[in-house]
Amino acid sequence: PPTIITVAAISIITNLFDTFDRLMEFSKKHLNDPFILEGVQAVSARDAILREIFSNSLAHRDYSTGYVAKFVIEKDRMYTENGNLSHGHGELKLDGFEPFSKNPPIAKVFREVSLADELGSGMRNTYKYTKMYSGGVPEFIEGDVFKTIIPLSSAATSMVGPDGNQDTPQDNLQDTPQDNLQEKVNQVVYEKII
């Protein structure tokens, strides 16, 4: 199995709205937001994807299990995992997907405060914006643990400056063992939601 190096791990023990906000802040800190046009309008495909996967994870999670929900950013993908009251097993496909609300009261509140749209739109939006963001196709895997996998391109995760490839002589003079550790740490980001 691959070794996972943790960049930052925080436990979030708060209400659903603050959890959503903290996940968004954390992700924006660790993922680039390349310039993307949708027609003539600039859009943040990164933020659109994050909104969908976080609201899905929080609104459809099985809170009765002891499974700790996760959000992980790796070099070539990011994914969420959460306990699930499954209605089948295996990969969900956009063309054969039948949406099912697992926590209708939470989903309703999320729609009311604009953290979610109509049932099933999250999967369509995630496909659309993942194609724009990384050129890839997301995976949604249904089971006792629900997993959403978003492929990432190098544009989404590359670092600029002392931790990337654009060092200046001044940066090199100031490199310390801590900088080397930070470079290793930047390989993977792990987030736990409790």
Residue ranges and their predicted role:
Residues P1-I194:
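C-terminal regulatory or interaction extensions
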